[in-house]
Amino acid sequence: NFNDPLDYFDELKTFATTSSGTPKDQFHFTYGSLEWFNLSQGGVSAGYGADWAVISATPPREIVVAYTEPNSPAVAPGTDLARGAKVLEVDGFDINTNTQAGIDALNAALWPSSVGESHDFTVQDIDGTVRQITLTSEAITLAMVQNTRVINTPTGDIGYMMFNFFRAPAEEELVDAINLLNDGNGIDDLVLDIRYN
C-alpha cells in the first residue's frame, strides 16, 4: 500500500549496480510538478549552463563540456568554459574516485538540483591549461536553438543550426532561426544539428 506515488515509484526503481559500479537503472527519475512545468514550458532548470558529455562513466572517467548556454555562469568572465574542456576534480574529489561519497559528490556538483548551489571544479581547457573555477547554479533559461549561421562554401551556402530541445519555446526560436537563414539570398542546404537533443 502506497499513499504517495513517489514512494511507489521508488519501490519499483532498482538502485543496484553492475560489477563495474554503473547503476542498472540509469533512466528512471522524477521531477516535481512545478520543476517539470518550468522545464517543459519555459525551458528553465537549475544548472550552470554547461551541458556535460559523459564520454566514460567509469574510471578512467571522461566528462567534458559538450556545449554552453549563452549568458550563463558557465560562460561568465573568469569561468569561460568552452566545448571540450575536461573536468578533472569536483569539490576536492578526483573525477576517477570510486568511493560512494566521491561519486555522490560528483553527481551533486555536476547536476545541481536547486538554484544557489556552489561547487569547486578543476578543469582542463582544450589548450591544456588546468585551472580551478567555482560554479554557482542559477535558473538557466535553455536556448532551444543555438549557433545559427550561414557557412559559405564553393558549392553554395549552407545553413547551420543546433537544435537542442523539443519544448514549448522551441517553436519561436526555430522560426527566428529559419528567418535568419532566409535573409539575403537564402541557403542551398541546411544542417540541422540534433546530436544533443
How should each PLM-predicted stretch be described?
Residues 1-196:
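Flexible, low-complexity junctional segments that flank or bridge functional domains
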